[in-house]
């Protein structure tokens, strides 16, 4: 049975500063690099051989993947695609989340960050993000799983939320409460015959 592994990048500089990041290209912190290394160590302990890896065009995801591959100790073909970029936070990008909450209220910020359909000003909703992530997921990532390949995906909180909510067929309330932690591997087995994902594992240690 092929395996799909989803991993959010490690802590970035703007994660540490509690700022909306979106498509702004900011680096990992030292903590983020350590988180990525730990994710690689966890995967190495499982003895899963990944056949292909996918990531976004943003350096925090790319570097996380590079650290994981180095820790695994073998080469994996890597495909980088804009479809896996974080959702675009529009006018919120670069702003401190607490300060935005002081202006607009915590509930409005929660809806901007976690709901399916509410867009931040001049930005993408999660539903908008799904319109680019899911076709790519179906075509490329699921296409590789259909070929019995083990697939590693390193991306972003919301690009991965869009994929997880699709895989698990979550409703809007479940999506609102869905969190993806930095550098914590999420694994699914994929049944080629039934076309279904099952046996979800979140490998937090």
Question: Residue spans of the language-model regions?
Answer:
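Short coil-to-beta-strand
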Residues: 2-11, 106-110
């Amino acid at each position: 049975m092929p395996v799909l592994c989803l991993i959010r990048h490690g802590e970035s500089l703007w994660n540490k500063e509690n700022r909306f990041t979106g498509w702004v290209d900011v680096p990992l912190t030292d903590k983020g690099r350590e988180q990525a290394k730990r994710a690689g160590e966890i995967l190495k302990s499982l003895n899963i051989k990944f056949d292909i890896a996918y990531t976004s065009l943003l350096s925090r995801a790319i570097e996380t993947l590079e650290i994981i591959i180095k820790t695994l100790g073998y080469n994996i073909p890597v495909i980088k695609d804009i479809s896996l970029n974080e959702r675009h936070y529009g006018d919120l990008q670069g702003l401190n989340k607490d300060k935005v909450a002081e202006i607009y209220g915590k509930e409005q910020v929660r809806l901007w960050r976690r709901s399916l359909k509410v867009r931040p000003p001049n930005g993408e909703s999660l539903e908008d993000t799904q319109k680019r992530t899911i076709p790519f997921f179906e075509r490329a990532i699921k296409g590789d799983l259909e070929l019995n390949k083990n697939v590693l995906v390193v991306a972003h909180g919301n690009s991965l939320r869009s994929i997880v909510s699709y895989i698990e067929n979550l409703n809007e309330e479940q999506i609102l409460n869905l969190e993806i932690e930095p550098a914590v591997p999420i694994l699914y087995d994929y049944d080629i015959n039934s076309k279904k994902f099952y046996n979800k594992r979140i490998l937090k240690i």
